[in-house]
Amino acid sequence: GNVFLRVQQIDKFRAEGLLLTQNTMAAKFSNCRQLIRRTLHDNAELREDENIQKVLEVLKEGIDKVYEAESIEEIVGIEGFCAKNYFSIFNKLITNKKVDFEFQLRTKHPPLDPVNALLSFIYTLATNEMAAALETVGLDSYIGYCHTLRSGRSSLACDLVEEIRCIVERFVITLLNLKIVGEKD
């Protein structure tokens, strides 16, 4: 790799890590809101759901709060609160219900149900693709601006995937709603 590019990357993240994190999380929350609104557009029966409306408001407030935050750690806390609320209504976005694909709670290590397994698997694919793309252009995928450095973790890839996680979520919702994935898959 190019050591000069790596030094520039580190300097940039030290100088602008907070702003980059603010922009990434604001975009993530905005994209989550768009995913929910798209589902509401396609499913009139969900439009008056108070919990869904509350989550839309929490995500909107989250956008404002990340720009008021004074540290990356504070933003991580805001993101955790918004994610918990977002996933509290995720099962409602899966409109073609099947017993095998009931979603209750986001679990990761390990995923405890088929929906969480799908989410984790496709997030991993997206993160690996992002890491490969970063390395292709000479960036160090292990040096990020939001995710803390940890041996073996592509922190920058994780940072950049945050903004597009809703694409993975929409893909999983579509797989389930169109019955592309079944219980035997």
What feature does the model see in each segment?
Residues 3-185:
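Active-site helix-to-loop segments that bind/position phosphate- or nucleotide-bearing substrates
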